[in-house]
Every structure is written in structure tokens, then in C-alpha cells.
Amino acid sequence: MIYSIIICAGALLGFLILQKLLAPKDTRPPLPPGPWRKPIIGNLTDFPPKGTPEWLFWAKHHERYGPMSSLEVMGQTIIMINDAHLGIEIMHKKSALSQMIPDAPFAHMAGWGMSLATERNKQAWKTIRANMKQEIGTRRAIATFHPKMEIGIRRFLLRTLDNPDDLRFHIRKEANAFMMDVAYGYTIAPHGKDELYDLTQQSVRQFSHIFSPGEWSVNFFPILRYVPSWFPGASFQIKAAEYKRTIERMTMVPYLWIKDQVARGCTRPSILLRLLQKGHYESGSHQEQVLVWTNAEFVMGGSDTTVSAVSSFFVAMALYPEVQHQAREELDRVVGPTTLATFEHRSQLPFIDALVKEVFRWHPASPLGAPHITQEDQIWDGYLLPKGALLLPNIWTFTHDPSVYHDPMVFKPERFLERQSSPPETDPMKFVFGFGRRICPGRFVTDEKLFLIACHAISCFLISPKDPGAPEPDWLPGVISQPGPFDLNVVPRSPAHEELIRSIETDHPWKNADATDISQFMARNQMI
């Protein structure tokens, strides 16, 4: 990487000096404060070190520079927003002024050019979002999937009962099983190898690496995309090719599998099938790519945020037993001690509803929000946000701002309840899933699944840390963050609750899985 930077820096040095000499004097307000810009490279070395939680690194800017800070890398201005009030004003109320998607050369090289995070073709972007909004973008749309959610969550309880030490694996499996069933009509293997499930997991892991801020030199020096992979410092070319192979298989395998089912006359309901039947898609066309990426976004985006939220929920219940007890008391009183809640109970369970909000606030799934680009010069608090600046909202600082949330480091669901002494605190749903037209279209999936998992897990299990004195775990860095290792005891409340969990085996026995069929299909078409 250093060789590539030196080459580009030398080529740009003369241009930047000339530009500085010839540029007219700028009479606009100053940029927000920030670290000193080094010659040529600016703040290229001021990004978080590898392995550092990005949101905590940027939160230090709040302490040093105030609610907004700025950096500059090779002429690209970056504005960090670390204040909840300011973030809502700039990115929500004035969202029309910063809706553009930032360019991400490495993501395009890695095959993610059609992702909602990078797609700059307005029509394609609108089509993907419109498809997702129609299928999962409202609570009314999500209600059609409630039966699938309920069955999947009960199976999750059973797997957790049988193998509680593999809780994180069960959380991931349940999240992906639901998404793949709804998107593709695909039934994952309850045990053993599943090629499509593994491919989805690999794509999700690579997503976090691809979109990690400051990770790839080519994002700062786009000309590097033309450097051959054998050139010193160009190992990103090899990674891009590897990631591209993965995402091409992940997007195309289920699509071609469903087309094969259509040809054989053995289809089953799915989002992809419904969209496929609405139009004609030429092989290799842009319209076909829009179609397959609609479903890829649904499967990967919804599953990863759900995994993060549910993992954080279990950690919170172990660390705050008094909250777990209060939630269980409400469930026993409203629903019954040996009855599982349904979505219809939510309006009668205010503490559980508040608990779900507190999970989202306590540790947002995406602690750094999706970046936006300003479409015109803006002035805020006497500082300039120039046209073309990259806006990065630090969602974690929004949800841990003591001027917005009392005792922000403490898990307190009651902060969202109606009380005579004080009004409820700000609903974190206002910002934890993004802003404006770039808000996460799958947010209601994560919200409703977390609600039902919380209800069922608290009703059926006693959750505690294996080490009673264990501190709160560290949260792992990444675009989607999850709690680090934290061993839990998850045991049934009573024999009656164990029997309730096991009733899923007779109420809804496993259907035949599609793992063998998809493996054979991939082998026939040389996709493995």
C-alpha cells in the first residue's frame, strides 16, 4: 500500500501546489475543527488503527473538537457528526440536502456495485428500495411473515435448549433461516453442511470488511484500481477478486435455482419468485442484476442486524437480572407463565416494548451510520459543510449522549416508559437505522423479531453469565458490530417450560431441507 501512496502522492503534488497558488481566496466560513492536516495526504493517517472500535475512536473527536469535526484526505472533506441533536437536524430534517451515495471504488471492484450502499444509478437504487419497501418496508407487510417468524423462533428455542453453549451459532442460523425462506423459499439444513447458508455467511463477513472506513487505499486514490495485482502494495486487487467471486455466487445461485424450479414446475412462494413473475429479465441484463440484488440486500442486511441485536439482548439480560425479572413478571401477568406471547400482545407489554428500544440504544447494530454526501454548501453553527463532503454520523455517540439519555451507559428500559415525573426519552428508532431515503428498509424485520425472541426467551429461559463477576464484554469493530465473547448460562425455567419448548417438534416438524438439492444444482452448474 505504501508504494501506491508514494506514486500517487508524487503525481498529485504538483497539481495540488498549483491549485493552491491559483485558487481565489476563500471567504466562506471555516470547516469544523479537526486534527492537523499533513501535506499532500491530509488526515490519511488519522483513521482508527486496525482492530479498534471505530465509534469509540471517533467519539474522542467529540471530546476534543465538539459536536462536529472534520478531516481531509486528498481533497475529500469528511465531517464526523457526534451529536444527536445536530445529527437529527442535518441528516433527518434536512436529509434532502445530503442524499447522495459516496463513491466506493473498492466495493465496485469487489462486485458490490449494485448494493444499496454503493449503487449510484438513481433508477436502479429506487427500484431496489421500492421492491424492498413493498415486501418488508412496513409493519403491515411484515405481518404476512409473522407465522414464519413464530415457527423459526420456536425452533431457535429448541436448538438453544439442546446446545446452549452454541447460542451465537443458533442466533445466526435462525436469522438466516427466516430471511432465506422468505426471500427464496429455501429451507436450510437443521444440521450439517449447507452450501447456500455458508455462502451467505461468507458474504456478510466480507461486507463488513469491504465497507470498513479507511480500510482500502484505492478509496482515497481511485487511480490505484488500474494498478496490477503483482505491483507492490496492490494486494487489494487480489482481495477484490476473491470477494467478487463470493458475491457473484451468493446473488446468482438462488436466482438461477429458482429459475430452474420454474422450468421444472416445482416452485414455492418467495419474494424472488413474485418479482420474477412480474416481468421479463434478459440474462445478464441490468434489470436482472437489480432483481437479484433486491433479494441479496434483504437476506444479508436483515440477517446481520438481527444477529447483532439479538446477541446484545442476551448479554443485557445476563448483566441486568433485575430487568430480566421485571420483563418476565410482565409476561407472566399478561400472557401467562406457560404461554408464549404473540405479536398481538405487544400493545399490552409496554416494558418489553421499552426493552427492545433499549437494546437498540444500548449498542446500535451499526454504530457508525451510513455515510451521506452533501449536495450543496451548508452552514451549521458557523461552520461550513461544503458540497461533496462526506457526512459520517456516529450513531453510538447519539445513543450515549447524556444530554439525550440519562445514565447512557446503563441498560434501563424504563427510560422509554410514560411516567408522571418525566416524559419518555427519545426513541432510538429515529436514528439507529439511518436517515431519510437511506434509512434501513428492513428495520421492521429486526424490530419485530427482537420483540418476539425477547418474549419467548425471557418466558422460557433463565439467562445469566457463567462467570457471575464477568464485566460487560467488548463490542467488536465493523460495519455491523456484535458483542465479543461472553459465556452465558441459558437454562429452562422449569420442566413445564422445557416441555413447552419441545412442543415445536410435534407442532411444526422440520420440512425437508434444500441443502442437498442446492449442492447438486451448484455442482451441475459448476458453481461450487
Curated annotation (Swiss-Prot):
CDD domains: CYP64-like (cd11065). Heme binds at C440. SUPFAM superfamilies: Cytochrome P450. Pathway: Mycotoxin biosynthesis; aflatoxin biosynthesis. The keyword Glycoprotein applies. Changing I528Y: In strain: SRRC 2043. InterPro entries: Cyt_P450 (IPR001128), Cyt_P450_CS (IPR017972), Cyt_P450_E_grp-I (IPR002401), Cyt_P450_sf (IPR036396), Cytochrome_P450_fung (IPR050364). Its cofactor is heme. Keywords: Glycoprotein, Heme, Iron, Metal-binding, Monooxygenase, Oxidoreductase, Signal. GO terms for molecular function: aflatoxin B synthase activity; heme binding; iron ion binding; monooxygenase activity. It holds the Pfam family p450. Residues 1-23 form the signal peptide. O-methylsterigmatocystin oxidoreductase; part of the gene cluster that mediates the biosynthesis of aflatoxins, a group of polyketide-derived furanocoumarins, and part of the most toxic and carcinogenic compounds among the known mycotoxins. The four major aflatoxins produced by A.parasiticus are aflatoxin B1 (AFB1), aflatoxin B2 (AFB2), aflatoxin G1 (AFG1) and aflatoxin G2 (AFG2). Within the aflatoxin pathway, the O-methylsterigmatocystin oxidoreductase aflQ is involved in the last steps in which OMST is converted to aflatoxins B1 and G1, and DHOMST to aflatoxins B2 and G2. PANTHER family: P450, PUTATIVE (EUROFUNG)-RELATED, P450, PUTATIVE (EUROFUNG)-RELATED-RELATED. This is O-methylsterigmatocystin oxidoreductase. The lineage of its organism: Eukaryota, Fungi, Dikarya, Ascomycota, Pezizomycotina.
